[in-house]
């Protein structure tokens, strides 16, 4: 038994979609979450800067005595995950491989779409992972740089959000049967995305898929939390306005949380 928390990092609030699924599947595990909303989005930034910011988040989580770190950010996973994983002596998990694997299982016509930040798409990481596992699957990647600002400003239900999503996704409509939400912010726009793509297109939430792998690693390294603990205390940190973060988090997690401000 290991009651240390699991650390989550993201460029902002998007990683809460992963946390929500973890709380549902593994309610006995404690969480420490850091969202770098002050510097979001990461996607348009240079690779060197993204790596620098990611290491700052990692080092913050290490001060919280975490037993595992989850990159709840596709951009950070694409740029820095392998380096961090090779450096630390605790398990470090990214969201890309779980999402890629789920897409392969989902597609019936071998036509998969991937949407993500400009950096995630430019890295080509999803296509590489998918075609490594299933060479016959065709992958169409599309950068959607306007999605993260919509979520970070809590405008998911606005008319402008619907127009942006419709305009952004039009190149993929009718061409795929599976769509990977290759940014953990994007599930917060899921109803609009599904409406645009149509009911026949299966949406893959890479963050939610990641939770299954978290469970596997907890078992493998024998670092599961206390199954009998009914109430666990989570901690949430943001580099931006805690009130905005709290508002979005409370809606998504369906519970009121306390959010602390941190300067990195």
Swiss-Prot record:
Enzyme Commission number(s) from the entry: 5.1.1.3
Keyword annotations from UniProtKB, A to Z: Cell shape, Cell wall biogenesis/degradation, Isomerase, Peptidoglycan synthesis
Active site: 73, 183
InterPro entries found in the cross-reference section: Asp/Glu/hydantoin_racemase, Asp/Glu_race, Asp/Glu_racemase_AS_2, Glu_race
Catalytic activity entry: L-glutamate = D-glutamate
Chain sites annotated for binding substrate: 10-11, 42-43, 74-75, 184-185
NCBIfam families membership: glut_race (TIGR00067), PRK00865.1-3 (NF002035)
Function: Provides the (R)-glutamate required for cell wall biosynthesis.
Protein name according to UniProt: Glutamate racemase
Gene source species: Streptococcus pyogenes serotype M6 (strain ATCC BAA-946 / MGAS10394)
